[in-house]
Every structure is written in structure tokens, then in C-alpha cells.
């Protein structure tokens, strides 16, 4: 809960393509509901695979209920830089933040939900 309380953005570095352990699903969902308006981004520790939260049931459910943004094929460094810029320069409008997050800058993201592999 400390992370949700203290930070405006949370970057989750998942297992594989976007798996979230089922054991934390309920607690994470409750925190998302309690701290609405936070930017929550799913990244992956797999360097060349990218994220796809629709592969596993828990990830699919969490993406829908917690408004996760996905890194897809962005590197963790790109995700961090974009997130920091968005927090400093963008309003609290989630739709604007999402549009800017998925805007390609210097080929940092090639695949998104609309044009996923």
C-alpha cells in the first residue's frame, strides 16, 4: 500500500509477458480502486518479448479493471522516461496520458494493442 500512497505512477515489472500472481490479485485490485488516478504501467523483465496482458486470465482481468497501460515492446528505460515526462507535463486526464504514452518517439514502441503482433 505504501507504493500506491506515495507515488503517482507505478511500473509493474511482470513475469514473462504480463503475468500477475493470482495470490495478489484481490489486494492489487483493492489498491487500484482506493487510489484511482494513479498511472499503472505493466512492463516485462523479458528483454525481447514485450508485454501482452491478454495472455493470462489474471493479467487480462487486471488490465480491464485497473486501467493498466502496457509497455508492449518498449524498453523499461523508455517506459520510465515517458512516465516521468507525462507526470511533469500532462494533466490528470487519463485519456490524454494514454494517447501520449503510446505515441512513438524515436521508434521506442512499434506494437500496441491496436497493432499487436
Which role fits each region the language model picked out?
Residues 1:
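Internal active-site segments that recognize and position negatively charged phosphoryl groups
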